[in-house]
Amino acid sequence: MAAGQREARPQVSLTFEDVAVLFTRDEWRKLAPSQRNLYRDVMLENYRNLVSLGLPFTKPKVISLLQQGEDPWEVEKDGSGVSSLGSKSSHKTTKSTQTQDSSFQGLILKRSNRNVPWDLKLEKPYIYEGRLEKKQDKKGSFQIVSATHKKIPTIERSHKNTELSQNFSPKSVLIRQQILPREKTPPKCEIQGNSLKQNSQLLNQPKITADKRYKCSLCEKTFINTSSLRKHEKNHSGEKLFKCKECSKAFSQSSALIQHQITHTGEKPYICKECGKAFTLSTSLYKHLRTHTVEKSYRCKECGKSFSRRSGLFIHQKIHAEENPCKYNPGRKASSCSTSLSGCQRIHSRKKSYLCNECGNTFKSSSSLRYHQRIHTGEKPFKCSECGRAFSQSASLIQHERIHTGEKPYRCNECGKGFTSISRLNRHRIIHTGEKFYNCNECGKALSSHSTLIIHERIHTGEKPCKCKVCGKAFRQSSALIQHQRMHTGERPYKCNECGKTFRCNSSLSNHQRIHTGEKPYRCEECGISFGQSSALIQHRRIHTGEKPFKCNTCGKTFRQSSSRIAHQRIHTGEKPYECNTCGKLFNHRSSLTNHYKIHIEEDP
């Protein structure tokens, strides 16, 4: 089109207030966690769009708070209960609160488009396109010169990876794409032709036509904008600015911190409509829904066996070959790719280039290789200052130190019990949910995790791979070996805060502490007697059932307790391990020795 035929281009002053979406304090309280996360994403996306223009720009305090995972209410107030980003924005927010729209997404959409010019004929907002003057007024606003009008692409066109790098919308396109319904035909993975589940997965696809001008100086990876480069550089620097106030764990991104904090608050915003069960993550709800539909979407190409979880397919595929799992398509219904497009492309393009010279295993990163090599070298650079125990990873040391401090930041919402790590909390939760996905082929016993199943199967095979280097005794699992080795080293890291007594294992400390508290959580359903230890309850129940599982191999007599059988067998063997220190007389029972001591006490009062 000739220059003379073009429409007159209005000059538009663009400020942060124009792209800000604000809520009153009452509105903020009513937002669900998922809605607050959407609000953060929208505000940060709008701010990044302004920064990407390359002109000087003062970061608003509300953006700094959102990047740190804080609520946007710690900025100064103007008396109206609205975040003070300026009188202009406060006025807009007050005006926007008059809306009667009960839908959060409708509200945020209305606010996000309130200042965008509309094409009354097409009923679609414009995108401003043009160059910017390299100057700022006193208010920090930018002057857009020769702005041309261009319609926002419809959802149908948005899946064609339309390049929008030269366009800038004052209101984030992300809002509209999240609120408008998904298109019926899912986007395709260009490498395998596999379909993707969500439009957002296509939006995460690298912009193929964009000029990747920002390069990482360490690994030379390129990015299309500075914000992506800064996020990536944190992987090299180890910078973790976002710290959890509960457990002090640090994260490189605010979104990771927000997701982590749910483990402390116990918030479960995702609810199953079938059974009412709640989950902290949408992915956990998605996995749970398969238990109702009995859907098994992940199929092994080798043998045709199907699994309801992709992790189950990965574990199964190791039976066929100890190779890269990407050899087999972990996709849905045996053909379509279940990962996001960006994840799918990484799987196909990435190679395991870090080789271990000891065992030949390959790894995708040098840090993973370093962690692995400590298995061969025995290197444990992270040492506990309290007991001197060393660990190969810093995370293991942090978890261990909680034994000494007594800190248990992860708490069960059902019973209130605390745990030192999230993995132990997850194992404990299975007690309440009763979920058991792994069945033993020998005895049919159901177990809650694959690792527990492997340890259980060693009962049938007799395998004991964990061997003590001092005495040669073997164990089925490493935790039993570690506990046994403390007999040789004399290490007793678990200390009672009441009396100072120390123990080799945490369970012994827990049982001991009930002496001080008087707690007896194990109750017999038959007679109502309570016990401080579960083993005592098990032995007691045999009185009601009449069960005597311990049998003497010599005479066939049976006993309720193994200790009673051991004492009985001394009658046949003639063993008398208990000796009187006064007269040297031997006894086969400790109780007999105790009664014998009374004779000497009476003789020498």
Swiss-Prot record:
Coiled coil: none
Compartment(s): Nucleus
GO MF terms held by the record: DNA-binding transcription factor activity, RNA polymerase II-specific; RNA polymerase II cis-regulatory region sequence-specific DNA binding; zinc ion binding
Expression tissues: Expressed in kidney and inner ear.
GO biological process, one term: regulation of transcription by RNA polymerase II
Protein keywords: Activator, DNA-binding, Isopeptide bond, Metal-binding, Nucleus, Repeat, Transcription, Transcription regulation, Ubl conjugation, Zinc, Zinc-finger
UniProt-recorded name of the protein: Zinc finger protein 354A
Major place of residence: nucleus
Gene3D superfamilies named among the record's database cross-references: 6.10.140.140, Classic Zinc Finger
Region feature Disordered, mapped onto this chain: 74-106
Zinc finger feature spans (C2H2-type): 214-236, 242-264, 270-292, 298-320, 354-376, 382-404, 410-432, 438-460, 464-488, 494-516, 522-544, 550-572, 578-600
Annotated Gene Ontology cellular component terms: cytosol; nucleolus; nucleoplasm; nucleus
Family: Belongs to the krueppel C2H2-type zinc-finger protein family.
Record-linked InterPro entries: KRAB, KRAB_dom_sf, Znf_C2H2_sf, Znf_C2H2_type
Primary gene name: ZNF354A
Biological source species: Homo sapiens
